[in-house]
């Protein structure tokens, strides 16, 4: 049986990367929350 998660670095970056987050207002809210929380890594 085929496993459901077939990781690809490019796809992860395209979907959850910093530039994708910055491109929408809600994405920027995500980054803001993660900064306030003190996350070392903000995005993929």
From Swiss-Prot:
It comes from the Bacteria. GO terms for molecular function: structural constituent of ribosome. Transmembrane segments: none annotated. Gene3D superfamilies: 1.10.287.3980. The keyword Ribonucleoprotein applies. Disulfide bonds: none annotated. InterPro entries: Ribosomal_bL34. Residues 1-44 are annotated as: Disordered. It holds the Pfam family Ribosomal_L34. This is Large ribosomal subunit protein bL34.
